């Protein structure tokens, strides 16, 4: 079943789960309950969507059970849902809403109040966008609505209406680490095929229990953290934020979760709070979104956990490659998922690797509101593939500096301060230089960093002067996006200041 709603019904028919989704607020729902409640909510939602035509519906909510119900209610209505990153600020949010032609946004007064988001909501409302609050929907609920929903429930279970699988199921937005966010429309087919690719690669059984704290607006949070387990018949525990570093290891242990997805930045933050039995039930710890440092691999190995590093982009729904228990090379991001074609284009002045292009049924063919289609998607990543088919990310094409005519990978340079100060975050940026075109500046949270000692170490490691940072800046707290990635745009502003 390709359509998300068809898949949900099919899974419930052949594998009832009493608690398919739970959350930290003690909410839970079975898969049959998820179908019924999404129908009930969807029917009432139509009363609020006045003159909405076929516009996407915005969703601005955290990782809780009601968010999953809202999401599947839009799929029941065969509407496109656009998931808004509420951490990205009013400028980015209004830009995303405009690109997606959104009129209505579903949210909750309780969430707005607890998140201190009233100023944000006010700014968005001033631009004529309308909010639909879950509390208002609940007030409209009547006994008649419940009876109609029961009738529709059985009609959908046994005589599902024909749904369009070619249209966008969801709109997500690129993280905007290097430029303004782009709208990415993922069709039901995109999401279906990527789900099948991941299941085939990782061989995940229906007995697994997922712990998902990456947000719905994150492509891994939604696609791999929610849709994959729910539509495969696995249980999932939702947690509203990955930023509760002290709490999350304890909840993973308490919920007996067996699958956990995260990023290197967050995994580092959890380390001080991991106990002997924290991961005793964990079968899969998969990291993506950014390169996993060797020091992170080493620390988790001490806790008896092998980090399976993977790679993906929102435009690929999102998974492209992953290390598995059987096929694993540290430092790589694993082998390509089944049925993904790739090609590597040589780049002038680059000594190693090339620019990665991909295509497949999980990959988009154009961005939102852009009529120009592409046969191959340009990932913007410089990569190499070894003789065994393992993929290595060498860096972003935009994260290279041209110094004295030579292309220098900022990601490659970062490996050395990370080795020198393994317990700290270090990011290299490029700044203009009158002599050599560009120069490197290191930003780190290492207190009292000694640039001379670092450069001496890097020289001993065999690097030429072109690879040595010219300046160093201390930054106590690094800007991190809601997706768990470091905000390179803000760091570049700091470097230039």
Task: Outline where the language-model segments fall.
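Conserved AMP-binding/adenylate-forming
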Residues: 42-88, 213-215, 407
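AMP-binding/adenylate-forming catalytic core of the ANL superfamily
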Residues: 105, 360, 366, 382-467, ...
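Gly/Ser/Thr-rich phosphate-binding loop
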Residues: 146-150, 257-262, 271-329, 341
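Conserved ATP/PPi-binding loop(s) of AMP-dependent carboxylate-activating enzymes
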Residues: 329-339, 347-375, 406-408
């Amino acid at each position: 079943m390709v359509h998300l709603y068809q898949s949900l019904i099919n899974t419930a028919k052949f594998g009832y789960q009493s608690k398919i989704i739970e959350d930290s607020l003690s909410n839970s729902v079975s898969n049959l309950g998820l179908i019924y409640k999404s129908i009930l909510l969807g029917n009432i939602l139509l009363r609020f969507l006045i003159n909405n035509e076929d516009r996407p519906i915005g969703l601005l909510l955290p990782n809780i059970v009601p968010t999953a119900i809202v999401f599947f209610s839009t799929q029941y209505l065969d509407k496109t849902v656009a998931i808004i990153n509420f951490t990205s600020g009013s400028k980015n949010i209004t830009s995303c809403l405009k690109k997606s032609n959104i009129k209505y946004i579903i949210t909750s007064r309780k969430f707005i109040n607890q998140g201190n988001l009233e100023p944000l909501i006010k700014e968005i409302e001033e631009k004529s966008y309308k909010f639909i609050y879950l509390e208002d929907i609940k007030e409209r609920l009547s006994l008649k609505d419940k009876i109609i929903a029961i009738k529709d429930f059985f009609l959908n279970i046994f005589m599902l209406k024909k749904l369009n699988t070619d249209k966008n199921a969801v709109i997500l937005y690129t993280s905007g680490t290097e430029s303004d966010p782009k709208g990415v429309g993922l069709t039901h087919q995109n999401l279906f095929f990527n789900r099948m690719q991941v299941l085939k690669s990782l061989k995940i059984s229906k007995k697994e229990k997922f712990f998902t704290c990456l947000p719905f607006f994150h492509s891994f949070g939604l696609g791999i953290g929610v849709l994959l387990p729910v539509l495969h018949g696995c249980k999932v525990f939702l947690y509203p934020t990955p930023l509760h570093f002290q709490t999350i290891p304890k909840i993973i242990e308490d919920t007996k979760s067996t699958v956990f997805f995260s990023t290197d930045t967050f995994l580092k933050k959890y380390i001080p709070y991991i106990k002997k039995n924290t991961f005793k039930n964990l079968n899969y710890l998969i990291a993506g979104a950014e390169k996993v440092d060797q020091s992170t691999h080493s620390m988790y190995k001490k806790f008896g956990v092998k980090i399976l590093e993977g790679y993906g982009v929102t435009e690929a729904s999102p998974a492209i490659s992953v290390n598995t228990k059987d096929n694993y090379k540290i430092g790589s991001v694993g082998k390509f998922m089944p049925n993904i074609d790739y090609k590597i284009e040589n780049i002038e002045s680059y000594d190693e690797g090339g620019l990665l292009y991909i295509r497949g049924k999980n990959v988009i063919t154009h961005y939102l509101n852009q009529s120009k289609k592409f046969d191959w998607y340009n990932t913007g990543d410089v990569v190499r593939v070894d003789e065994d088919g393992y993929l290595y990310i060498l860096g972003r094409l935009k994260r290279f500096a041209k110094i004295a005519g030579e292309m220098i990978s900022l990601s490659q340079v970062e490996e050395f301060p990370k080795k020198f100060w393994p317990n700290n975050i270090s990011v290299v940026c490029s700044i203009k230089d009158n002599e050599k075109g560009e120069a490197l500046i290191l930003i780190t949270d290492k207190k009292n960093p000694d640039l001379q000692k670092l450069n001496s170490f890097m020289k001993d490691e065999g690097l030429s002067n072109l690879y040595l940072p010219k300046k160093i800046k201390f930054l106590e707290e690094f800007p991190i996006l809601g997706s768990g990635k470091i905000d390179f745009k803000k760091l570049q502003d700091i470097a230039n200041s």
